[in-house]
């Protein structure tokens, strides 16, 4: 597995934060690093496999990667990221208690992926721009200024994430997409889902297409197929059982959609034939 080292990314041996844009981010094999990372998805779509679990990411996704996490990107489509790298909580001179602003693992579950709306994403861009222009002076005021900007970024993300709730259409769509991550295997009536999240059906279709480039049903199918591929690789369930577990009522239809999405059949994935090009 590829290991990325801080010496290759941080401007100096003492700098606690670095900005690393990926415009665009191509598919990238599984790796981990000796620093922490906040991944901000500007736009585009892709699959982020995080500690073996697949997530569909799009503009507004924010992922918190710790120094022991492993992850990779695949099936990227114009995926543009801004990575805010930071060494460790004890690398800062003026900041303490950062863990209170970061997602925390509880009972083995780590809420690594948050979502923010487009208005907040614009504020994030402005803060990142200030961080990039802050210079690399090591006198106390310069260091404090850079650390303050990093703290402002964490506060903005924390306040604006799904954890804090919101009422505008962007936030409602973010909540809907998070709901689909947990309920993808259920029969989905888009009219009922739109009503559940206080969106008109037309707004749901338009905004989901703007965020992901996919219609609602196409997005749901991709989500189901990604989850199915994970089960094919990491479980002993039959192809038919996996199809049903992931919301497909017909295993033949599932196999057709699967091959169309990944250019491999479910059986190919089960037998590891795709591993050669991973």
From Swiss-Prot:
BP GO terms, sorted: positive regulation of DNA-templated transcription; rhamnose metabolic process
An annotated GO cellular component: cytoplasm
Location in the cell: Cytoplasm
InterPro entries linked: AraC-bd, AraC_XylS_family_regulators, Homeodomain-like_sf, HTH-like, HTH_AraC, HTH_AraC-typ_CS, RhaR_RhaS-like_N, RmlC-like_jellyroll
First-listed, main subcellular location of the protein, grouped into a coarse class: cytoplasm
SMART domains the record matches: HTH_ARAC
Location of the HTH araC/xylS-type domain: 174-272
Residue ranges of DNA binding: 191-212, 239-262
Domain of life per record: Bacteria
The entry's keywords: Activator, Cytoplasm, DNA-binding, Repeat, Rhamnose metabolism, Transcription, Transcription regulation
Single GO term (MF): DNA-binding transcription factor activity
A Pfam short name: HTH_18
Residues with site note (Interaction with sigma-70): 241, 250
Reported function: Activates expression of the rhaBAD and rhaT operons.
Known partners and oligomeric status: Binds DNA as a dimer.
The protein, known as: HTH-type transcriptional activator RhaS
UniProt source species: Salmonella typhimurium (strain LT2 / SGSC1412 / ATCC 700720)
UniProt gene name: rhaS
